[in-house]
Design a protein with these regions (language model features):
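Short, internal strand/loop/helix patches
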Residues: 95-128
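Structural recognition of the beta-strand scaffold that forms the well-ordered cores
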Residues: 45-49, 78-85, 104-107, 124-128, ...
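Thiol-/selenol-based redox modules, centered on thioredoxin-like
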Residues: 127-151
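Conserved redox-active cysteine motifs that mediate thiol-disulfide chemistry
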Residues: 41-66
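Active-site-proximal cofactor/substrate-binding loop regions of enzyme domains
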Residues: 59-70, 74-81, 87-96
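N-terminal "domain-start" segment that seeds a small globular fold
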Residues: 13-38, 59
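Solvent-exposed loop/turn segments at secondary-structure junctions
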Residues: 51-56, 86-91, 109-113, 133-134, ...
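Sec-dependent N-terminal signal peptides
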Residues: 2-15, 102
Length: 151
């Protein structure tokens, strides 16, 4: 019985922090590819959830893209950052996230299953380790990127 419960628990955890979505950012190295956390094996991943039509969410995507570029510029290639927006009417504002960014931009279809299964809220940032396991999450609504970056 313990083995069955362990398998069920593992399956729930794996399913909770998984998805299969297409990268819609033509500036991204994975543009047009189907992205899932398992694609980033052996890389720490940050998953940002936001609304493409909100200014603060768009600003956070820009800041995370700056962070991603700084990591790449310093040859830190074992960290990936992706942004996960929402489908439906939110998709009319996809260009807000795509312009001037090079990180993968993913869109959760109208049912928002990824947002729901992760328990994500607007401007939540989730961290998965290099094995795809959950590490931590927090909301970056009041995040002062410049203050953090310059420390």
């Amino acid at each position: 019985m313990k083995i069955i419960l362990s398998i069920l628990c593992f399956s729930y955890i794996f399913a909770q922090y998984d998805y299969i979505l297409e990268d819609i950012n033509p500036n991204s190295s994975t543009y047009g590819e189907i992205i899932a956390p398992s694609v980033f094996n052996n890389q720490v991943t940050l998953h940002y959830f936001g609304h493409q039509n909100w200014g603060t969410c768009t600003a956070r995507v820009g800041q995370l893209n700056d962070l991603y570029q700084d990591l790449l510029d310093n040859e830190i290639v074992n960290v990936r950052i992706v942004a996960i927006g929402k489908g439906g009417s939110y998709e009319n504002s996809n260009s807000n996230w795509i312009n001037n960014t090079s990180m993968p931009i993913l869109i959760d279809p109208v049912s928002y299953e990824v947002w729901e299964s992760w328990g994500a809220g607007q401007r939540d940032l989730y961290f998965l380790d290099s094995e795809g396991s959950y590490v931590n999450d927090f909301n970056i609504t009041s995040w002062n990127y410049n203050q953090i970056y310059n420390q």
